[in-house]
Amino acid sequence: MMKQINADVKPHFGEIWMCQLKGDGSIQNGYRPVFVLSNDKNNAFSTTLNVIPLTSKMNKRRLPIHVELWDYKRYGLRTPSTLMTEQTTTIKVDSLDYRIGVIGDNQTLARIKVALSIQFAVFAYV
C-alpha cells in the first residue's frame, strides 16, 4: 500500500490554493492563487503536483489559452482572475499555503479543458 506523503496538505483536482511560486522574468512568481490540475491519485501520494497560476490582471490580451473568472467570489477569490494555462507548472506540495476555493462547475471546467487542449495541442497530433 502506498504511503501518503503530506498528511497536512491534501489538495484535490479543481481546488484553488494560495501558493508561493518561484519564477523569474515572465514566469509567474510570488504569493498567488493556483488551480490544482493534477489528478487526486497523484495528489495523495506525490510530493509534487501540477498547477495553473492565476493573475488578477484582467487587462492582458484575451487569448484562447486563458480562462477568465469574472464570477470570482464563487471560487473564493478576492478579485476577477485569469487562469493562464501557458504558465502551467510543477510545484512541491509543501509550497501550498491554504485552500481558498474550488472550481467544480462543469461549464468552467470545460473552458479550462479547451484552453489546455489548445495550449498543449493534445489532440492536434492524434
Label every PLM stretch briefly.
Residues M2-K3, V9, Y72-V126:
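C-terminal terminal-subdomain/extension
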